[in-house]
From Swiss-Prot:
Keywords: Dipeptidase, Hydrolase, Manganese, Metal-binding, Metalloprotease, Protease. Mn(2+) 1 binds at residues 255, 336, 381, 420. The gene is pepQ. PANTHER family: XAA-PRO AMINOPEPTIDASE 3, XAA-PRO DIPEPTIDASE. This is Xaa-Pro dipeptidase. SUPFAM superfamilies: Creatinase/aminopeptidase. Mn(2+) 2 binds at residues 244, 255, 420. InterPro entries: Creatin/AminoP/Spt16_N, Creatinase/aminopeptidase-like, PepQ_N, Pept_M24, Peptidase_M24B_aminopep-P_CS, X-Pro_dipept-like, X_Pro_dipept.
Amino acid sequence: MPQPSLSSLYSDHLRTLTARADEALQRGGFEHLVVPSGSTHYQLFDDRDYPYAVNPQFKAWVPLTRVPDSWLVYTPGKRPTVIFYQPFDYWHVVPDAPSGWWVDHCDIHIIRTPDQALALLPKHAERCAILGEPHSTLGAYVPNNPQPVLDYLEYQRAFKTPYELALLRIAQQLAVRGHRAAEAAFRAGQSEFGIHMAYCAAVGQDANDLPYGNIIALNEHGAVLHYTELGQQPPQPLRSFLIDAGASAYGYASDITRTYAADPDSDFQALIDAVDAAQLRMGQNVRAGVDYKQLHIDAHLALMGILKEFGILTVSPEAALATGVSAAFFPHGLGHLIGLQVHDVAGFAASDRGGRIERPPGHPYLRLTRVLEPGMVVTIEPGVYFIDMLLDEVKKNGHAASVDWQRVEAFKPYGGIRIEDEVVCTDGSAENLTRPVFAAA
């Protein structure tokens, strides 16, 4: 069956966005939605810009990520307007003229200076819901970020359109290409920096393009959850490799983690295999009506069961969870929403009118507490780590007998394990976006 084109998918996506915007504006009492793309600004006491990052509310409408000082304007009943800043500039590369599958669906105006946008924005700024950062202020058009508008739009962003799913799949393909190159570099004995460069070259993206800083962790560095130091020399001996790295596709992110052992016959490889199999089962439980908080708790029990089997825990999974010992080995959340942002918004939202669903007690780093619904895309990223600071807390809290410390010492040189896929909640079985791409790569 032929796949729909991005142009047709975008047309449907735009209808969804305009319907959402109509409702959001009605709730907020505004007549126009105005979204600046964001602006560049200097670093403190310097004449160099901070790296530009596009406003996520802007790239939801159009697949443009490097167009500072541009604007999106939507008025109910009218086509979206894109005010596209294309300066006369011989110091920097100027954005190409708008092109692609989206241009026929919007009214596009080219401006040469930022203040030319004033003549194209709605006449009455006070009637506009302006979603952006303070630096985007232009004349009377000051971002006001009205809460009823944001609450509705951000809540609805959890439900991905077919167009968004198509772009998320492209982001998966790019990232997996990088992951394969990174694994090969690890097997060849490269340093963290060398592995990182191999990844970027394979994906075709650098630090300004990637959705987040690559985590390239060899040996004990795998115990640092967000390790981004990129050592220049490979450690000796080389034992393990944890990579958490994604890619960007037209403003949408992927977020994938894999862990490798240098010795395929080691106990660490066996532990990786056990966590990998458990992670796959966790992903299959992403179903409509399931509370993500419960998935997180179930992940704790599953991982502690593995540690018990490997002789690392001496108590039951339930006891490890109840006493907080499990959090020493699995100290982060099971995952989060993903889309325009790696940690996509409204993970705690109680409804499209606001409110908050709190995390379970004792689990302060879980980033998603909602009940799953069709269209949501979530990460499933269980992990097991050997972190001195957290293991010391186990001893201080009187639970040293819950752990076989000799087994812990044997695994500490490997740092930790994390496996992460992206999974779509559907009306039926879960759809894993990541595994099929690895299988085909």
